[in-house]
Amino acid sequence: MTKRNPKLAALLSVIPGLGQFYNKRPIKGTIFFIFFISFISVFYSFLNIGFWGLFTLGTVPKLDDSRVLLAQGIISILLVAFAIMLYVINILDAYRNAERFNRNEEIKDPKARMVATWDKTFPYLLISPGTFLLIFVVVFPLIFMFGVAFTNYNLYNAPPRHTLEWVGLDNFKTLFTIGVWRKTFFSVITWTLVWTLVATTLQIALGLFLAIIVNYPVVKGKKFIRTVLILPWAVPSFVTILIFVALFNDEFGAINNDILQPLLGVAPAWLSDPFWAKVALIGIQVWLGFPFVFALFTGVLQSISSDWYEAADMDGASSWQKFRNITFPHVIYATAPLLIMQYAGNFNNFNLIYLFNKGGPPVSGQNAGSTDILISWVYNLTFEFNNFNMGAVVSLIIGFIVAIVAFIQFRRTSTFKDEGGL
């Protein structure tokens, strides 16, 4: 039997399909060759314009829309990346087929070969629609946002009236060196972190406390109590937030007029005072978030074997010792990834911040409200002030912070260590 040179097969595959012909696989070689010829003939013009637009962002105002050119450039990059991936597959396929032939592992029967090929490629065919959807719904917008962060896209340079320009790191310099931007950014990110840590920790603590109380053996009517405690979760958060806005209204809200004023003689300005607005937001988020945590912890608590507690009782353990050494470690071990996602979700909790008072009240000398978090500030920068480039910069920072923190925390959880993840 004549041996085949795998390196020669790979070298011949520089011209797509030629390596497959060398390996006596004419059908596969023809498919590779036709695909790449078709790719070049169909997309050559689009790729030419796409890469030109990506580098120049247009040269003639009103005629060249920089946004469209940027989008075409990104799509061109994705198409070329896809073509390169298939090109590498073409080379590797030729190399591996030659190796299999030399080891006498090549399937001789053409029909059996087609069946084997189908079995290998079928899983990839199944996931391909979802993969393409992911690319154009998630990856493409992220790359577009990344590109906008390095342009001068704002109200005064908006296309198609003007063409955009690449400005490098100027937008990042503006955020960290210009007084009003620097002051606003650090004020907003400080409140974002405080809001995330305090609100999420309180909702988790309340959910855990209630789950332990309801799960206590002497408590009667557990089903009814659990149903009542989960009800806030059943009501759409949009509706709940609007109800709380009315309750916290400075002038006619029931919290001031019917509770605090008659009982304590005080009427905090919940919507117009920065401190009390933050207190109200944290309280509302605790109300909105604790039912999910309560339901989560309830399920975990019921999975803990009673034998553990009986053994602890025999050893003379107190209630606190049983909680510290049995209940709490077991609950955290089982729910750590979901609890981390609670923090990540509140870090980007746009709905509550915007619906309550649109990030207000305003702050003198800043271009963000006193209760704006990073995500609501991005919304205002983008849709209220048309400052798209700065909105994209802040969005990149948000994504970077969330990704790094989540990655570190996931790696530290026992659940992922035990499963060999990350």
Region locations from a protein language model:
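A structural signal for multi-pass alpha-helical bundles of membrane permease subunits
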Residues: 46-54, 60, 123-422
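N-terminal signal-anchor/first transmembrane alpha helix
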Residues: 3-8, 13-16, 22, 26-27, ...
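Hydrophobic alpha-helical membrane segments of integral membrane proteins
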Residues: 30-31, 393
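A conserved catalytic-core signature of glycosyltransferases
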Residues: 16-17, 369
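Amphipathic alpha-helical interaction segments
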Residues: 41-45
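Hydrophobic side-chain positions on well-ordered alpha-helices
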Residues: 20-21, 382
